Amino acid sequence: MNKRDAQNISDKIVAVLKEERIKKGISQYKLAKDTGMSKSSILYIENGKQHPTLYTIILISKYLNVEIGSIISSIDNMWQ
């Protein structure tokens, strides 16, 4: 695995989390406010201008009530 592969995985994780946020009708503003993040951070992460840390991924996934394992499984299925 190289740096580009890691970035692709990060992009896919963000895509899953963004899809869940939208599906649940949660705005970027509400997500930012409720998680203590800035709206610009959420915007940059979702637009691929910033890669989230593991802490940020866990924080957002817990807020959205999305299991990390299910995210990894969906990415693993995409990867094959």
Report each predicted region and the residues it spans.
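Short, charged recognition helix plus adjacent turn
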Residues: 1-8, 70-80
